[in-house]
Amino acid sequence: MELDICSLGNYWLENEKKFSIPKKRGMIKMSELNNRKMTGFASIDKPWLKYYELNADEMAKEVAKNKTIWDVIEESLIKYKDITAIEYFKKEISRPDFIDSVYLWARALRGMGVEEDEVVPIYGTFFPDVFSITCALNLIGATPYFLKLAMSKKDFEIETSESRFAIVFDGMWNNVKDVFSDDRFKKVIIITAADSMLSPKKEIVTFFNYIDGIKNKSLVPRKDKYIWVDTAKKMSDYYTGQVKVPFKENRNAFITSSSGTSLKGGVKGVIATNESAIAQLYQANNAGINYFVGDKCLTNFPPTASTSLNCLFLLPIYRGMTLINDPRVSESGFYKQMMENKPNVALTTGSLWEAFFRNIEKEIAKGKNVDLSYAKMWIIGGEGTNPAYFKKWNELMEMCGSKTPLYSGYGMSEVFSVLSVETLNSSNDARKIESPVISVGIPYPGTNVKIVDRLGNELRYGERGELLIKSSTAMKGYYNKPELTSKALSDGWVHTGDIFSVNEDGMLFLWGRADDKVILPNNEEMYLFDIANKIKSDKDVADAFVNAMPLVDGQISLVAHIVFNPEFIGNREEKYKEE
C-alpha cells in the first residue's frame, strides 16, 4: 500500500471535528489503547501510541516501492505547483522553476563527468543552488556527502579520498583549500551567497565579498578546475542523454555528518538510503506534526546533519511549504529572521532560542505588543535545556498569542534525523511532570525504543540507561567505517550513546551522554550531568555544566562552570564554595 503523504498531512485538520478534541491540532489521544495490561517494558508496551491515531504505527511502516527521494519530492512539487518553493533575500523561486533547476544541474553534473553511485562532497551551508544540486545528485544516482564544517585536514582527506568532484561555499574556502586543491579533484564547483540574489543586491554582495577575500587572503584561485555556478550550469549543454537512472534498492541517497557523540571514532559520515529517507517522511506524517501546506519554514542551518537536511528542507518542501532560506546564523540574526519572516516552522539550538526569548522579554518590557500567533511548530533540541527556562519560554509564547507551545525533540543522523518530538497532546501531559530535565517527546510512529543497562538488559519505566532505537529510518552504516558500523548497529537496534529514561506514557527524557561520568574511589559511577542539573535547580542559576580535569597524580578535579541569572545579587564566587 502506497500512501499519499501530502494528503495525510492535512488529514487531522480536515477531520478534527470528528474527534471531540476542540481547537487542537495534532493527533487524537487514543486512550482506549491503555486498557491492555502493561508489562513495564517500553519496547513491548509502546505506551506512546495512545497519542497517535489508531493505525499510525502500521501506516508509518509502509514503504515507497521503487521510488527515490527525488521521485516523491518531484510529485509534491508538481502537486503544489502554485506555492513558492524558496524565498531567498526577497527573491521567490517557484516550484516549476525549482524543478527546472534540478534537471539543469543534473545535466550539468553529467556533463562534468559525475557518474552513478559517485560520492560528491558538499562543504558549506544551504543556498538555492545547494537545494537543487542535492536533488540533482539523487536524480542521477550519485550521493551528496554533507561534510562536517569543523574537521582536521587529515579527516577532510580521509572523508573525500574517493571523490573526484566537490562543491564548496567560497566563504569557507580557507577551511578546505589545502584539501580541495588536491590533483585528484577533477572539478570543484564554487557556490557564493550572491549567486541567487536579485540585482542590485547581487552585485553589491559580490563586490564586498571580493574585498573581504582580498583582505583575508581567502579568494578562490582562478584555475580551470575551480568553476563558478554560472559556468557550471553551462556544462549542461554538453550532456543530451538521459539523466534519470533506474531505481536501485538500498542505494546511498545522502551522507550526513554525525555529531560525533553517538560513538567514539572521530568524524563519521552517516549513510541514508532512499528507503530510509522516505521512511522519515512517512513517520512524520503519521506523527501529525504541524508542517502544513502553504506555511513557511525558516531554513538557516547547514545541511551537515540530517536534522537540518530533513526537517528544514526535505520534509517542508515535500509537505507543500515555502523555505525561507537565510544562511546567516547568530543570536541577534535569529531574532531578526524570526520577526521579519514570521515562519510557522523553526528549529534551532537552545542558545538561539534563549537569545530569541530574551529579546521578546525586552520588547514586552518596553510596552510593545509582540505577535507570535503564527507559530505552529517551533522546536528545540531538548538536551541540556533548563526546565525553568523552558517553562518561561512557553509562557511567553502563550502571552504573545501562540496557539502552540515550544516543542522539544530529539534526533540523530543515525536514524536520519528525528526519533521523538512532542505532539500537542503529549506536550500538555509533559508540562505536568516535575523533572530535572525536560521531556524530548514521544517516539515517532513506526519506531521502537528501549532503555538498556551496560549488559544490554532492558530496563523498566523510570530507570536510566542507554537508549536503543529500532526504525526503518536507521542508517545503512558509517561511510567506509565497517567496524564502527558493527558497534552502532546490533540486531537492528541503533545505539545512541545517550542516557535516557522513559515513563509509563512513553515520554522520553534525555539526561546526558553515557560517557559523561567519573568513577569514584568505591568504583561507583557518577554522572556529571547530575551534578550540573542539581546546580541548575537553583533559581539563581541560568545554566551550568561540569567537567573532569585530570591532575598530575592521576586523580581528577571536578570543575563546575556556572552562568548566573542577570538578576542574581550576591557573591557569585562564594555561593557554591562550601557546597
Language model regions located:
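Conserved AMP-binding/adenylation subdomain of ANL enzymes
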Residues: 141, 278-296, 304-347, 354-366
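AMP-binding/adenylate-forming catalytic core of the ANL superfamily
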Residues: 471, 476-477, 499-579
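Conserved ATP-dependent adenylate/AMP-binding module captured primarily in the ANL superfamily
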Residues: 149-181, 197, 280-298, 330-344
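N-lobe entry segment of adenylate-forming
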Residues: 2-93, 97-112, 195-220, 242-246, ...
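Gly/Ser/Thr-rich phosphate-binding loop
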Residues: 188, 203-207, 219, 227, ...
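Conserved AMP-binding/adenylate-forming
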Residues: 88-92, 106-151, 300-302
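Conserved ATP/PPi-binding loop(s) of AMP-dependent carboxylate-activating enzymes
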Residues: 425-428, 436-446, 457-487, 507, ...
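Conserved AMP-binding A3 loop
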Residues: 94-96, 244-246, 253-279
